[in-house]
Amino acid sequence: MEKKTRLFGTDGIRGTANQYPMTPDMVVKIGQAIGYLLRKEAEEKSSSVRKVVIGKDTRLSGYMIEQALASGLNSMGVFVQLVGPLPTPGIGYLTRTMRAAAGIVISASHNPFHDNGIKVFGSDGFKISEEMEREIERLVLEEDLTPLLPPSKEIGRTRRIEDSQGRYIVYVKGTFPLEYTLDGMRIVLDTANGASYKVAPSIFQELGAEVIQLGDDPNGTNINDKVGALYPQKLAESVLHYRADVGISLDGDADRVIMVDEKGEIVNGDRILAICALHMKERGLLKGDTLVATQMSNFGLEKRMNEAGIKLVKTGVGDKYVVEEMRKHGYNLGGEQSGHIIFLDHTTTGDGCIAALSVLAVMKQTGKKMSDLNHVFEDVPQILINCRVKRRAELSELAGYNDMIRNIEKKLAGNGRVFVRFSGTEPVIRVLVEGTEKAQITQFAEEIASFLEKELS
């Protein structure tokens, strides 16, 4: 095996369970590396806080990885609190409120069940910095950690926390305006057989909604299996069948959401951002009159924001880059077309339940149906193709690539764009083409995808 120099992608460490780096021995060492850094930090601050909160989604491999992580952390003198299946943002919240030194989520988000991953939050509830990621990688890949283990009497313990779900439910409900309820609203809710299958229905039901559930029967292998935010078609059909007011679809770890209006039309992350940004600006709540999005967002969103006097700032793809930009400049709303929506007034990362409640609050406060809100802007035609590849390469160094892109951009004549990037979480390269003519941009996207599949297979 070639020497690995990186473990972290754009959203933590990911891989196939029981394959590198998601093997028990590697996960133990990852736990030890995190534990060593936390112990070192506590000693430098003369602090006794060496507590880590660990949550997970519903994947079969979550049990194995949970035990391996806890063992590694315990061996470095760190105390572990296991909270079981809970949305990723819930771990960020509990890390802060339980005064833990760190929080860890065991999840591969929207990936299939056979994948799993590790995301790490700092004591402030935000994902750790790239500098800390590099230091964890260095310890895992280059160091023998055995000499760094503390004496036997300083080994940590692990215990389970039983009321974590209730704490998260109360916290999320608290973001909904007190003067409103969801009484009389019928919601179809798809929890992707994932981390939110228990908490999400309770949140909406306790606020008064009638909830019809999909994807609420996890068995360890059916997470994201034709359900959840990547598969909103079934949700749309159910909304029409049950004559619901709205559909809400979460992904496996519930940090993102896609919605459906009462007519069965999909409301993606761009539209959720636009709906909330316009509503917040109207009420003087949008800090800096600015919305943060990514390069994947539709140009129609940018046009609508400009018309409304809202500045749109674009970052690299990945919710952590959106959060970095928001924190750096004090903005309070940002997100991605894929459904990661971040309300920094309430949370430290994308939260599908909070985002959905924010849209429902707009419906209640304006008296508008979801379909009325969904007409917030007109999409510029956009084609996205995900190509599975076997290797990565510097695209500009592939023979013929630059000429192909230049030729396509020339034909678009300033009325569109081409955006190509490797996924940070999957062996996939994403090809995005925007323009005025759908047939033309489809042809261009397929041409680029065919070229890349051939060159990178």
UniProtKB/Swiss-Prot annotation:
One of its GO terms (biological process) is carbohydrate metabolic process. Disulfide bonds: none annotated. Binds 1 Mg(2+) ion per subunit. PROSITE patterns: PGM_PMM. GO terms for molecular function: magnesium ion binding; phosphoglucosamine mutase activity; phosphomannomutase activity. It is an enzyme of class 5 (isomerase). Keywords: Isomerase, Magnesium, Metal-binding, Phosphoprotein. SUPFAM superfamilies: Phosphoglucomutase, C-terminal domain, Phosphoglucomutase, first 3 domains. Pfam families: PGM_PMM_I, PGM_PMM_II, PGM_PMM_III, PGM_PMM_IV. Activated by phosphorylation. Belongs to the phosphohexose mutase family. This is Phosphoglucosamine mutase. It comes from Bdellovibrio bacteriovorus (strain ATCC 15356 / DSM 50701 / NCIMB 9529 / HD100). The lineage of its organism: Bacteria, Pseudomonadati, Bdellovibrionota, Bdellovibrionia, Bdellovibrionales.
